[in-house]
From Swiss-Prot:
The gene is hisps. It is an enzyme of class 2 (transferase). Residues 683-1108 form the Ketosynthase family 3 (KS3) domain. This is Hispidin synthase. Pathway: Secondary metabolite biosynthesis. The architecture of hips is the following one: adenylation (A), phosphopantetheine-binding/thiolation (T), beta-ketoacyl synthase (KS) and malonyl-CoA:ACP transacylase (MAT). Hips homologs in bioluminescent species lack two domains, the ketoreductase (KR) and the dehydratase (DH) domains. SUPFAM superfamilies: Acetyl-CoA synthetase-like, ACP-like, FabD/lysophospholipase-like, Probable ACP-binding domain of malonyl-CoA ACP transacylase, Thiolase-like. Residues 1564-1576 have a biased composition (Polar residues). GO terms for molecular function: fatty acid synthase activity; phosphopantetheine binding.
Length: 1678
């Protein structure tokens, strides 16, 4: 601890003096959200951490840290210093390859990282570096206080730091690979002295300010020198101040967490948190300026009073420093005008922060050498030509710093920038270029580089061009340089050519050849970077390009030697004139040629007439100049400024000018007013029936899309690129010219839904993840269950482009990225293939990349396929675009395609490029015939599509007006439409000035017609102004916009367009056109039609014509109070609960009149997954109530069973009642037909009115006398009708049981009897068992055991004529007796006298007793007659005759039906057998719930009934049974077939309901290991168990665990991933290769054979495990 008598020697001493001083100890030192630390608390916590760290790594450790700024990390830094150690913070966004290099350089004692950082945990393990993982949620200020404030104060044996020891290891930000990593060691002494110097400078800047206790707004990462040498040292610790987090760490739990962007958070803190110091980068100050001025580019807008408050707060800041890069002049001017005290700091890590600092005016005036921060430093400028020079005063050169305090060099990296003399003076060459003003101030000019910086923002590396030029045999040496040389940004690129001696001898002939060398180079360069011939200097033989002694171009001397030659103009400057009265083609051509020759500096006629303008080096500026000069010289000509892009060479431009000047009418390429459509091969119309999308701004549904378009919400959709993507600040604005984009969530993904393990999902590119999601969701939007497509010829077309994911993978994992998932996870071809594979569809599966027209190409290819295929009627179209790596953004910046302001200001005077956006869109296309068949909702009809190419234009990426106009014409012709038939056009509309002009010209060329537009002006919309440019998905976003306009009846206005800023160069009068800035209503006539246009930088053009759907005809509304089945399903129980919650919200807002359609769609329009909910509701209110009840229940949903576990139970006689089939027959035509046909047949054969009894509508006739003969037939007909009806719905039993008479129906279901034979048997049996009037008989049911009933019979003194016998044993306390009517009366009376419940049945025969012996001969005769028609059982029959199971494949005994009528019914025994051997649900098929009740009484709990008790709704009971079967037992009826049977089926329609709630989890390389590793878990123990055939040593449970471990191992599940044993291997993503590995593993390790059938979806993993355990047990028994 520092004594108060001695000055502090380290910042740690300063901190301890404050923390242990009674006057300052309780001051706040740190504020994070609502949490605060005092100096004393931080001292205590850091001491405790030091003690813990000491036990881990000892004294004087080097502790590396990879984490965002976090309170725990600051405490840790102090702890490391208290141990005498070195703190090495590493940028959290550094790629893994660089992190590995950094760790090798610093050789840390340990690496401290958040517990969630699996990637760096793996990396550290690979490098054998101990890891200390902290849990961010357990490391908050309150949690650390709770844990450590009770600890004792710092122990006296902590050594503290040697002032001359490195306190920090900081890496520079310039590294591009491990080879140039530079680590700067900064000692405690150096840090303290520089901090003191910086504080002294602050006081000089603000002498009136008391800095004591200042509140400092902290933002800079602690891996950056700015954080330590500005925020922490000079301002916080040296002033006993408080460090305030500008943004709360992402992992820090706090109630005050602010999700706003950095600029908004900083502004909020400056206004309301009392901060007085803030150090930041230029873009932050630019953002604050934009907030103050409410610029349209800012993410969040302030109210007028808030803007005033922010400006006032900025004016009262004490320190507001900008570092890291030079401040924009506009921001500097704004600060000066508004008296905002901005200061500028220029420095680098090697110098411990700023070298110079000064007020904002220093940008222009320079920095005083007095404002240096290294006390003993000397600054001087040196020559930068790498040659020796004597010491002399120079006014410009590289800055060199000389000081004894500077670091002695980089750690572990030898660099000539540092040198140390014998006296200990360190000389450091900064690599920065400065000039010295006459008054001795230093002005920063930039870095010493060879790159050419253009005024247009592009940066050009001249060396590749120089190399290409030197490949010519004519050129000896070439130098490419900007026209400003080294004096600033260049407006043009120049070339100096030194010829080979042999070329010089050819004289003038070389000029033409050299021009041809430039042609292909210029053709491939963006227009601003092309080298015009007027900027090419070909040297004379005596002239040479200056070179250094090292053989490199001496670029500094270029201006001195050739400046005047390159700066002069070439050619004749006199202007040509033309006589407006007489136009001669030859004179006009010469005039045009003369102007082009002079502007381009090309005098060779052959070159002018044979090369394109691009090949001649024409830039955008030169093209504009030529158009303006031609307009000025040639009276009567009014060429657009992009004329040279429309007419791409001299001959075509001359012809166009001649035609305009001579008032010639060019060939009319506009189609006739109406043409017959071009016939497609199949004559099929294609319609859109489904859509889904993921767009920036969380635009994921039609409501949010509509709101975004109508409100023109671009400012909330296009946002700053966050740090969790990449460190964008390190690229902006030098390499990437924009800092905003439209981004979607690419980190979170529901991998298990798509059958992927977490490991495989990590390798799946976000582009493909989104494609999968939207494709599946589009099918749901179209109400197409995915299983409906299985095995079909459905096609899949996906448009993608390079998303940088492969680069990210390789950067993250290096060679280790090449796992078995590498290819399939990132190859573009698998984007479509994966969708086809998951859906099991067999049509074309094609991935397209034509850049920004990809989506349109997919639509076109799909339509060709659907119209030409006789086997297909559906196609899935998708386009997906993400940006995982900043490389494409740099490409766009270099091409000049993007807007520095981050917007698409299409068709405005502000148009300066587009803003890239991410997004994915999917559409479902069907033939109209199929859509009408399936009752689909049609969103639009696709009238025509067309794909073409620009051909040769001003370069590959340049637009071609003629080609675009031809595309429009072709579309109209294919659609058979005139221009007037198109109401609006969704433009490509990227917002580039040249592209906008070309697009409008093409529309004018194609749509200008001699016939006036009676429908009003042609409206031009541009969705990119709101959404941004989603590139390959752009055409599909355009389609979304059109569909939205069709639905809303209005075209949205363009964002960024106002009433005053429409580009005046756009011709809106010819067609005419309307480019709206507000929504425009679409008036009649209908149908509305629109064209969608797209253009890829590949040159591929795409166009689509869409027609709005017919208006829905108003039909009589369905009653909204009828019973309807409502179902919901999900793949996990958490998803199901979320789904139900979302449905509750949805239904509360829904129209009650839509109740039936919602329920119908839930059944027929969704896939049915394993976790289910189903209910029967009568109206919307009822449905909402049932959902609320379910959500209020705490019982988690369970997965449904397999479909095979289903048995039918058939009731016997006594369950019948008049009209028992009436209600279901009325409700369902399918059942009505089945029961009517069978009843009619039975009536004809039996002579009884079976149909009238079953379908009687006078069901009030209760007192109908029993007729056992007719009753038996009725029961049979009813139950067999229900059986057949269920079978038509796909509900089939896997086992059956029949009570008495019901066993005949059961035998039909089991396949033992045909329906005809069974009907004949029932009729014959009923006739044979007919009751006798002379011997009246009956049956009675008694609530007593069989023994008790036998005892009762014995108590009666009965003669043979009035005998009784037990005829049915239904259960332990349910026995039925048969006998004479008198005997029945007697035993019932006796039982009641003994308090035994007993009642006579409504039957007039004593079945299953000696009373039916007279029927035996006749039944035996029937059996003998039909013995040849007997068939083996197809499913098990639990016989109530035998009380046992008759297995599948067995035949019934020939006397089975004889014994069946005569012998007692052993239902209880049969039920017991069923309980022991059958697992699943049993459905009571009977007309009343008798079998259901009997089964329950015998202990079978999984029972449901299709019928209700008499007097209750049979339809509700039936639907309730279906709900039960669906929810709990995995039964999926044919809902489409069921609903088609309803009387009002034609009025049921599919409607929009909720789509699946994906359970997304984070799947990013930054948060998970990129190379799968196995932790020491059960997985590893499972592996040990399988090191040989050890099966015999394992118990069943161990064997089961070992098999499960093997499955998890092969699936590469992470340790925290559960294995759902109820799922199939296939559903979890196991392919045939993986299955072969599993079979080998279990076969070699356990000696067990895994049957191939377990790879199918028919079996679960649990069933496979059980099979293998049984296999092992059987093997042991043998």
């Amino acid at each position: 601890m520092n004594s108060s008598k001695n000055p502090p020697s380290t910042l740690l001493d300063v901190f301890l003096d404050t923390a242990r001083n009674l006057d300052t100890a309780l001051r706040n030192v740190l504020e994070c959200g609502e949490h605060r630390w005092s100096y004393r608390e931080l001292d205590t916590v850091s001491s405790a951490l030091a003690q813990h760290l000491r036990y881990t790594v000892g004294l004087s450790p080097t502790v590396a840290v990879i984490s965002e700024n976090h309170p725990y990390i600051l405490a840790l830094m102090l702890a490391v210093w208290k141990l005498g150690g070195t703190f090495a913070p590493i940028d959290v966004h550094s790629p893994a390859e660089l992190v590995a290099g950094m760790l090798n350089i610093v050789s840390p004692s340990c690496l401290v990282i958040p517990s969630s950082d699996v990637t760096n945990q793996t990396l550290a393990c690979d490098l054998n570096i101990p890891v200390v993982a902290f849990h961010p949620h357990q490391s908050t200020i309150p949690e650390l206080n709770k844990k450590y404030l009770t600890d004792s104060q710092i122990s006296p044996d902590l050594p503290f730091s040697d002032p001359n020891r490195p306190a920090l290891y900081l890496f520079t930000s310039s590294a591009t690979s491990r080879s140039n990593l530079k680590c700067v060691p900064l000692t405690h002494t150096f840090i303290l002295r520089n901090s003191l110097s910086k504080r002294a400078w602050c006081k000089r800047m603000r002498p009136e300010t008391d800095f004591d206790g200042i509140r400092v707004l902290g933002w800079a990462p602690w891996s950056h020198v700015l954080a330590h040498m500005q925020d922490i040292g000079p301002l916080t610790l040296l002033n006993a101040g408080c460090y305030v987090f500008a943004t709360t760490p992402s992992t820090y739990p706090t109630e005050l967490k602010d999700d706003r962007d950095l600029i908004s958070c900083a502004a909020n803190a400056i206004m309301y948190k009392g901060v007085k110091s803030f150090a930041c980068l230029p873009f932050v100050l630019g953002g604050l300026k934009a907030l103050c001025e409410s610029e349209p580019s800012v993410k969040a807008h302030l109210q007028v009073e808030e803007r005033a408050q922010l400006l006032k707060s900025l004016q009262h800041m004490e320190i507001l420093e900008c570092g890291g890069a030079m401040l924009e002049a506009s921001v500097a001017s704004w600060a000066i005008e508004n008296c905002i005290p901005i200061s500028i700091g220029i420095g680098m890590t090697e110098t411990g922060g700023a070298l110079f600092a000064g007020p904002v005016q220093a940008i222009k005036t320079g920095f005083s050498s007095e404002d240096k921060f290294i006390e003993d430093a000397t600054y001087l400028l040196v020559k930068d030509d790498h040659e020796s020079h004597a010491e002399e005063d120079i006014n410009e050169g590289e800055l060199v710093v000389k000081s004894k305090m500077l670091p002695r060099g980089y750690l572990g990296y030898s660099d000539p920038s540092f040198s140390v003399d014998d006296a200990g003076w360190v000389t450091f060459r900064t690599g920065d270029r400065y000039s010295v003003t006459p008054d001795g101030k230093f002005s920063w000019l930039g870095r010493n580089t060879d790159f050419i910086q253009m005024t247009s923002g592009e940066t050009l590396d001249p060396r590749p061009i120089e190399s290409s030029l030197c490949e010519s045999s004519l050129i000896s040496r070439a130098c490419v340089i900007g026209d400003k040389f080294l004096n600033g940004p260049a407006a043009a690129v120049c070339a100096i050519i030194e010829l080979e001696p042999t070329a010089v001898e050819k004289g003038q002939a070389h000029s033409r050849e050299i021009a041809r060398v430039f042609a292909p180079i210029n053709r491939d360069l963006p227009p601003p970077l092309r080298i015009a011939w007027s900027h090419v200097l070909v040297l004379q033989p005596s002239e040479k390009i200056p070179m250094t002694k090292k053989g490199t171009i001496f670029r500094k001397k270029i201006e001195q030697v050739f400046g005047s030659a390159l700066g002069g103009s070439s050619g004749d400057n006199s202007q040509a004139t033309a006589d407006a009265g007489v136009v001669r083609r030859d004179e006009l051509s010469n005039t045009v040629k003369h102007i082009i020759s002079r502007v381009l500096g090309v005098s060779d006629d052959e070159l002018l007439w044979t090369l394109s303008f691009a090949e001649l080096g024409m830039t955008s500026a030169l093209a504009t100049r030529i158009a303006n000069e031609l307009n000025e010289v040639l009276v009567g000509v009014n060429l657009p400024i992009n004329a040279c892009y429309i007419h791409v060479d001299l001959p075509s431009l001359s012809n166009a000018v001649y035609a305009k000047l001579a008032h010639l009418k060019l060939p009319d390429r506009t189609p006739e007013p109406r043409q017959a459509p071009v016939e497609n091969s199949g004559g099929k119309e294609i319609v859109v029936v489904g859509q889904a999308f993921r767009l920036p701004g969380s635009i994921n549904d039609v409501a949010s899309l509509r709101d975004a378009f109508l409100a023109r919400q671009a400012s909330s959709i296009i946002t700053e690129i966050p740090s969790d993507r990449w460190d964008h600040a390190s690229f902006y604005p030098k390499d990437i010219r924009f800092n905003k984009a439209g981004l979607v969530d690419i980190a979170n993904y529901d991998h298990s839904f798509f059958g992927l393990t977490a490991t495989e999902a990590l390798y799946l590119s976000p582009t493909m993840r989104l494609a999968l999601e939207v494709s599946f969701e589009a099918l749901e939007n179209a109400n197409i269950p995915v299983s409906q497509l299985k095995g079909s010829q459905t096609a899949v077309y996906v448009a993608t482009t390079d998303d940088g994911f492969e680069t990210l993978l390789n950067a993250e994992a290096g060679y280790d990225a090449y796992t078995r998932f590498y290819g399939t996870g990132r190859a573009a071809s698998t984007a479509s293939g994966r969708i086809s594979c998951l859906l099991d569809v067999h049509g074309p599966s094609i991935t397209v990349d034509t850049a920004c027209s990809g989506g349109a190409v997919c639509i076109d290819q799909a339509i060709d396929y659907l119209q030409s295929s006789s086997a297909a009627d559906t196609a899935i179209i998708c386009a997906s675009n993400t940006h995982c790596w900043p490389g494409s953004f740099r490409f766009l910046s270099a091409q000049g395609m993007v807007s520095p302001g981050g917007r698409c200001a299409t068709f405005t005077t502000d148009a300066d490029g587009y803003v890239p956006s991410e997004g994915a869109v999917a559409f479902i296309l069907k033939t109209r015939e199929a859509a009408m068949r399936d009752k689909d909702t049609i969103l639009a009809t696709i009238k025509a599509t067309q794909i073409s190419h620009n051909g040769r234009s001003q370069g590959l990426v340049a637009p071609n007006v003629n080609s675009q106009a031809d595309l429009h014409r072709s579309l109209l012709q294919k659609a058979g439409l005139s221009p007037a038939d198109i109401r609006f056009i969704e433009a490509h509309g990227t917002g580039t000035s040249l592209g906008d002009l070309s697009e409008i010209q093409a529309i004018n060329d194609a749509y200008t017609s001699s016939q006036p537009r009676t429908t009003g002006p042609l409206i031009v919309s541009a969705s990119k102004t709101v959404i941004g440019h989603t590139e390959p998905a752009g055409p599909l976003v355009g389609m979304l916009s059109v569909l939205n306009s069709f639905k809303e009846g209005a075209v949205p206005g363009l964002a960024h367009l106002t009433a005053d800023n429409l580009n005046p160069s756009l011709d809106c009068s010819s067609v005419p056109l309307l480019i709206p800035y507000q929504p425009v209503h679409l008036a009649a006539p209908k149908p509305h039609r629109a064209a969608v246009r797209s253009y890829g930088f590949s040159g591929t053009l795409g166009g689509i014509v869409l027609e709005a759907p017919d208006e829905e005809r108003l039909e009589e509304e369905l009653p909204n109070d009828k019973p309807m089945l409502f179902v919901v399903s999900a793949k996990t129980h958490t998803a199901l609960i979320e789904y139900l919650g979302r449905y509750l919200e949805f239904l509360l807002q829904a129209n009650p009149q839509d109740f039936c359609d919602i329920c119908y769609t839930s059944c027929v329009g969704r896939e049915h997954y394993r976790y289910r909910y189903a209910c029967v509701a009568n109206d919307m209110e009822d449905l909402i109530g049932q959902l609320q009840k379910r959500l209020g229940s705490k019982v988690p949903p369970k997965p449904s069973y397999k479909r095979g576990a289903l048995a039918f139970a058939f009731s016997g006689q006594g369950t019948q009642f008049r009209g028992m089939a009436t209600e279901l027959a009325k409700a369902y035509s399918g059942f009505r037909k089945i029961v009517s046909d069978l009843a009619k047949r039975a009536s004809e054969l039996s002579g009884h009115a079976i149909d009238r009894f079953l379908l009687a509508y006078d069901i009030g006739a209760e007192n109908v006398a029993p007729d056992s003969e007719a009753d038996q037939i009725c029961i049979f007909v009813y139950q067999c009708s229900v059986l057949r009806w269920l079978q038509t719905m796909g509900i089939r039993p896997s086992a059956v049981i029949g009570h008495s008479l019901g066993e005949i129906s059961a035998s039909v279901a089991a396949g033992a009897l045909s329906l005809d034979s069974a009907l004949d048997l029932v009729i014959s049996r009923a006739r044979l068992l007919r009751s006798s009037a002379s011997a009246p008989a009956g049956m009675a049911a008694m609530s007593a055991s069989q023994d008790e009933v036998v005892e009762l019979i014995g108590k009666l003194d009965l003669d043979k004529a009035n005998s009784l016998s037990v005829s049915v044993i239904n259960g332990p306390q349910n026995t039925v007796v048969s006998g004479s009517s008198a005997a029945i009366e007697s035993i019932v009376a006796l039982a009641k006298g003994r308090k035994i419940k007993a009642s006579a049945l409504n039957i007039n025969q004593a079945f299953h007793s000696p009373y039916v012996d007279s029927a035996v001969p006749g039944l035996r005769a029937w059996s003998e007659k039909h013995i040849s028609s007997a068939r083996p059982l197809q499913i098990p029959l639990y016989s109530t005759l035998l009380g046992a199971q008759i297995s599948e494949g067995e035949m019934l005994n020939p006397d089975h039906w004889v014994d069946h009528a005569r012998k007692p019914v052993q239902f209880a025994q049969a039920a017991t057998t069923m309980k022991e051997s059958f697992t699943g649900v049993i459905i009571d098929i009977g007309p009343q719930v008798v079998a259901w009740s009997l089964l329950l009484s015998n202990g079978l709990t999984s029972v449901t009934a299709l019928a209700a008790k008499r007097g209750r709704s049979q339809q509700v009971a039936f639907l309730s049974a279906l709900a039960d079967l669906y929810q709990d037992y995995g039964v999926v009826p044919d809902f489409v077939g069921l609903y088609a049977q309803q009387e009002d089926a034609s009025r049921l329609k599919k409607t929009d309901i909720l789509t699946y709630p994906f359970q997304r989890g984070e799947e990013t390389l930054s948060s998970g290991s990129s190379t799968p590793t196995l932790e020491n878990t059960d997985l590893d123990s499972g592996k040990e168990l399988l090191m040989g055939p050890t099966r015999g040593l394992l118990r069943a449970d161990d064997l089961r665990d070992s098999i499960v471990s093997s499955v998890k191992d092969v699936l590469e599940l992470k340790s925290n991933e559960d294995l759902d044993l109820s799922e199939s291997l296939n559903a979890l993503g196991m392919d045939s290769i993986m299955f072969a590995q599993l079979r080998k593993r279990i076969g070699e390790g356990l000696g067990l054979n895994v049957p191939m059938v377990f790879l199918s979806d028919a079996f679960s993993i649990g069933e496979m495990v059980s099979n293998l355990v049984e296999q092992a047990e059987a093997s042991e028994d043998n």
